[in-house]
């Protein structure tokens, strides 16, 4: 390497040479004398003789750029520089620290890189090896120029050509000087960051070295933990040695699990655990921690043993990942349930709390994926059920589906990570899959894979949290994008069998796949929000409380035996469940969607084959459903549809006349199960009755009915098995409109804000009693005309024609 003018007999060269000599090690003395000129060789030998300890840095370890950019100090000659360096090396008997000088030179160079400018030289572009040696002229910028450049750098570290030109004119600099200043400034920032990271790594390395040395020392001189004396070599068992290795591996894995959890939740959490890896789920009222025992995940709890084996994903134990995710989600749910303003604000109707998204992102360091809408709500209320019974219902996928038939189309438990502790459900953690629905063909079903985790915080206080385990992916025409953020409920026992339930729902979804008619409903939280879940829970628990009571209301038919009541209610439950599954096209009955050219695009037509199902007639089943907006309140629409005397206004099964209620079972206020008969029966309908179930709550209403045979219903009302009664349900789902305005559906209707209802009409019809028969276009058109005619009759009866 040719250092050119660095060793010239100029004042600048002498000073630089002296600095270079101060960095030479004794071992490189011979090599240095071979390249120095005669005048400098003597000084090099004199300087090297003063070095007491060998230095660690050689001249050949410095880059040509850093050597070339060393600025000479004015007013000093070679002798003064040499004397100064000699004093720094050995004067006063002090020990020389090579790293201190090396660090000071680097910092000095960095401090100049932002304010000094080498004419014609770029810190990123120059190639010292290809250019002939030459003297470098330095131009120090004025403080005003430096201030302007620094201010611009804070706003834009990478200015474009136009910005550099404007800056050069304003500061009276060449554009190349401005360009090189920014290049050098970026290099300086990068170097400082790397130095900081290196310092942290060095500290960590020093800690590991010290720990390694202490462990080695302990292995050389083992001490007995019982008596404190020296232990024999065989005292440390092989099993304990493996446990120590496993403990070290788990500590490393824990850090990776925390990082992976941040990807699921969209924000990062720093958890600090003690040496025993205690996994605390929170604190109880006494301030004590509640921790999982070592046998957590053993499956010895009260849940049925299902798939217990864990798999490994990317080298990380899946059970550890899911456990960390559940703990983080539980912590967030409890905070959301307990917090008030400014995190939560009251909705316009005052029925629920709405989440302040800005405050949420600040509180939980969350990042929202671009292109996704957010729905978040919180509702509290009293429910006639104790906390443990509710938690057990939520942790059982079948009972959960039965409790929320209009919300959950299908649910399965795919893996039980923990069945609880000490024979209880406390601490149960399981992986679930569910299809969540709104009863309309215009709202896609939400297929969600999520964790469900329950924990007892205190006596009579439980919490159940759900959190998605699917990362958000870009949707390319496939399944709807949905991410269920920490959601669930906190339940607290009060008195007389009641509980106070605080329900929180938080999700992110792709709004582009939702029909314009239903977007306001979902934004308001009435579609999948907390108000709907809590209202359904309150209605179902009220029904259960009435049914298990021994008293019979005056409106009920006393001729039905207790066994007949139970059998009839079970039949109505199956009818309602099949009705809901035929609207949103989940995978419960393997519906196949049809596309017919002359059918309205807002009408969903599906078909399936019914074979060997005693609860349905065999053959080809056709389902058709559509949703419309009506300028009528949900209560008014519900009262009209469930009134048997007004049924002749819209139902073709009534033969144009009123219907008579033969039997009734009350399930709550304005809801129950009825058995209807037409007063104008013809010869073909002499053996047919109508089974109808009606229910209503704050989130919506439901009217479901199905034709049934009279002989079969006699068996049911006497306590017989209802599973052999064949029926195909039809009916209506009524939802509040969510406060939509005149442009909500795009069909030109002018509608008042919040004054209407969203009506879903659905029919299931047997078009052919042969399962192998072909479905004809005429059958599809018949069902489509039936829906259109029914909607028009309802509009006319309510005097709300469009």
Curated annotation (Swiss-Prot):
It is found in: Nucleus. This is Homeobox-leucine zipper protein ANTHOCYANINLESS 2. The gene is ANL2. Residues 134-193 bind DNA. Probable transcription factor involved in the regulation of the tissue-specific accumulation of anthocyanins and in cellular organization of the primary root. Interacts with AIL7/PLT7, ANT, BBM and AIL1. Belongs to the HD-ZIP homeobox family. Class IV subfamily. GO terms for molecular function: DNA-binding transcription factor activity; DNA-binding transcription factor activity, RNA polymerase II-specific; lipid binding; transcription cis-regulatory region binding.
């Amino acid at each position: 390497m040719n250092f050119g003018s660095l060793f010239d007999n100029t004042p600048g060269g002498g000073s630089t040479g002296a600095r270079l000599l101060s960095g030479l090690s004794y071992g490189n003395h011979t090599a240095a004398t071979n390249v120095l000129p005669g005048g400098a060789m003597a000084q090099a030998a004199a300087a090297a003789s003063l070095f007491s300890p060998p230095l660690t840095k050689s001249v050949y370890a410095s880059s040509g750029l850093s050597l070339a950019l060393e600025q000479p100090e004015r007013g000093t000659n070679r002798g003064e520089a040499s004397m100064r360096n000699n004093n720094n090396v050995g004067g006063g008997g002090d020990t020389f620290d090579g790293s201190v000088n090396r660090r000071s030179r680097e910092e000095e160079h960095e401090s100049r890189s932002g304010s000094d400018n080498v004419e014609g030289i770029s810190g990123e572009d120059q190639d010292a090896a290809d250019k002939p040696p030459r003297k470098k002229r330095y131009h120090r910028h004025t403080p005003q120029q430096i201030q302007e450049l620094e201010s611009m750098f804070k706003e834009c570290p990478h200015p474009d050509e136009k910005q550099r030109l404007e800056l050069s004119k304003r500061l009276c600099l060449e554009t190349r000087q401005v360009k090189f200043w920014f290049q050098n400034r970026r290099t300086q920032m990068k170097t400082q960051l790397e130095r900081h990271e290196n310092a942290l790594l060095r500290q960590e390395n020093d800690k590991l070295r010290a720990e390694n040395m202490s462990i080695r020392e302990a292995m050389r001189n083992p001490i007995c933990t019982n008596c404190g004396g020296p232990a024999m070599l065989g005292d440390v068992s092989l099993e304990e040695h493996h446990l120590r290795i496993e403990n070290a591996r788990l500590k490393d894995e824990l850090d990776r699990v925390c990082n992976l959890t941040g990807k699921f939740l969209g924000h990062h959490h720093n958890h600090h655990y003690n040496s025993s890896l205690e996994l605390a789920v929170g604190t109880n009222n006494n301030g004590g921690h509640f921790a999982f025992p070592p046998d957590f995940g053993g499956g010895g709890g009260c849940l049925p043993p299902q798939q217990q084996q864990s798999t490994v994903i990317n080298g990380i134990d899946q059970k550890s990942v899911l456990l960390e995710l559940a703990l983080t989600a539980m912590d967030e749910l409890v905070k959301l349930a307990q917090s008030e303003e400014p995190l939560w604000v009251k909705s316009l109707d005052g029925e629920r709390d709405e989440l302040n998204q800005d405050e949420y992102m600040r509180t939980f360091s969350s990042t929202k994926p671009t292109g996704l809408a957010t729905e978040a709500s919180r509702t509290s209320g009293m429910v006639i059920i104790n906390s443990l019974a509710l938690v057990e219902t939520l942790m059982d996928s079948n009972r959960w589906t039965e409790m929320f038939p209009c919300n959950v189309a299908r649910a399965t438990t795919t893996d039980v990570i923990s069945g609880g502790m000490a024979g209880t459900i406390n601490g149960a953690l399981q992986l679930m899959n569910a299809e969540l629905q709104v009863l309309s063909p215009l709202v896609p079903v939400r297929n969600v894979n999520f964790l469900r985790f329950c924990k007892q915080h205190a006596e009579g206080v439980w919490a159940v949290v759900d959190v998605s385990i699917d990362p958000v992916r870009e949707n390319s025409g496939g399944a709807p994008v949905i991410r269920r953020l920490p959601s669930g409920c906190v339940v607290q026992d009060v008195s007389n069998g009641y509980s106070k339930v605080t329900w929180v729902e938080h999700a992110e979804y792709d709004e582009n796949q939702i029909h314009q008619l239903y977007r306001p409903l979902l934004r308001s939280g009435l579609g999948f929000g907390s108000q709907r879940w809590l209202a359904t829970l309150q209605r179902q628990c009220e029904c259960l409380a009435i049914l298990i009571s021994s008293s019979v209301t005056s409106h009920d038919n006393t001729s039905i035996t207790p066994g007949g009541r139970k059998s009839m209610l079970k039949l109505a439950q199956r009818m309602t469940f099949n009705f809901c599954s035929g609207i949103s096209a989940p995978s419960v009955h393997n519906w196949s969607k049809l596309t017919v050219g002359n059918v309205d695009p807002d009408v969903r037509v599906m078909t399936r084959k019914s074979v060997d199902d005693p609860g349905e007639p065999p053959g080809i089943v056709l389902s058709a459903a559509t949703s419309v907006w009506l300028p009528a309140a949900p209560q008014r629409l519900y009262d009209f549809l469930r009134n048997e005397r007004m049924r002749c206004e819209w139902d073709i099964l009534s033969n144009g006349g009123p219907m008579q209620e033969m039997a009734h079972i009350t399930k709550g206020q304005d809801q129950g199960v009825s058995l209807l008969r037409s007063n104008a029966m013809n010869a073909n309908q002499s053996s047919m009755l109508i089974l109808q179930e009606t229910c209503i709550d704050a989130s919506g209403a439901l009217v479901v009915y199905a034709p049934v045979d009279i002989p079969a219903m006699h068996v049911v009302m006497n306590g017989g098995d209802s599973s052999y009664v064949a029926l195909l349900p039809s009916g209506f789902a009524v939802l509040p409109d969510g406060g939509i305005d005149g442009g909500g559906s795009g069909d030109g209707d002018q509608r008042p804000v919040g004054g209407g209802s969203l009506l879903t009409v659905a029919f299931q019809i047997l078009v052919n009693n042969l399962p192998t028969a072909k479905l004809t276009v005429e059958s599809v058109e018949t069902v489509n005309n039936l829906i259109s005619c029914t909607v028009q009759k309802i509009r006319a009866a309510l005097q709300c024609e469009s």
